[in-house]
A protein has these predicted regions:
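Secretory targeting signals
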Residues: 24-71, 101-165, 206-211, 215-219
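Aromatic- and glycine-rich beta-strand/loop motifs that create alpha-glucan
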Residues: 1-24
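Terminal transmembrane helical anchor/hairpin motif
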Residues: 33-53, 172-241
Length: 241
């Protein structure tokens, strides 16, 4: 708990928490503005109202979420790398793996808050603007959970990368390259491409149905835990040079 409290203070100071809160607010605002401007066009699409609400608005929200994750993870080790502080932590009564786990938990919780803010906006739109009886809260909750879960491999992967490179431009470049390659591959039906975390985060955005894909969700969970385990192992056994 002490490590978590210290990390919370650090992430407030280096801007990680404000970045993810801003992502949630901007995503919610985008949903409102987009639906207001395109309401008639969206509701006339040959899709079920809930599919329109969730899949047609999620694309840009996903981009905001992705770059919010990339920026936050690039910033999260900034304080540790200043003055090579992270190298000295091994001589202090501080657990570097515990610090890594706390950073992961803080990122996860704050990203979940962002997802909740965005989906509160979608719920408001659904209750107010969809045809009577068309809004389904259960469908919204399932899609929100699905979009959160499919984003977690990128968060876990980017934290792993950021923890190993002192120059934040390296993980930032990897994040941008991952996004571009994910965009190019997301529409492919080849299951092997699901090993690419940036393909997984794009799956809800390119789907025409709001129903979660259980295969994608399972792979997302496995990748998230795998990247987390690798990051914890490196933090414990691979000291910073």
């Amino acid at each position: 708990m002490k490590t978590l409290a210290i990390e919370l203070r650090k992430e407030k100071r280096n801007g990680v928490i404000p970045v993810l809160l801003a992502v949630g607010v901007l995503g919610a605002a985008y949903a409102f503005v987009n639906f207001i401007m395109r309401k008639d066009t969206l509701l006339n699409l040959p899709l079920a109202p809930m599919d329109v609400l969730l899949t047609q608005l999620y694309g840009m929200i996903m981009v905001l979420n992705l770059f919010g994750i990339v920026v936050a993870t690039c910033m999260i080790y900034n304080m540790e790398f200043k003055g090579s502080a992270v190298k000295k932590m091994y001589m202090l009564p501080v657990s570097v793996p515990a610090m890594y786990l706390c950073k992961f938990l803080i990122l996860t919780v704050m990203f979940l808050v962002a997802i909740v803010l965005q989906n509160l906006a979608l719920a408001q739109i659904g209750m107010m603007d969809l045809p009577d009886g068309a809004f389904e809260m259960g469908t919204l909750v399932r899609f929100a959970g699905y979009s959160f879960l499919t984003s977690m491999p990128v968060l876990s992967f980017m934290l792993l990368i950021s923890s190993r490179f002192e120059n934040m431009w390296v993980p930032l470049g990897i994040g941008v390259a991952g996004f571009l390659s994910g965009m190019a591959l997301a529409n492919s039906g080849l299951a092997l491409l699901l090993v690419h975390p940036f393909v997984i985060i794009l799956k809800p955005a390119v789907a025409m149905s709001a129903q979660p894909d259980s295969t994608v969700a399972l792979v997302a969970l496995v990748e998230t835990l795998l990247f987390l385990a690798v990051g914890l192992w490196l933090a414990k056994y691979r000291r910073y040079e």
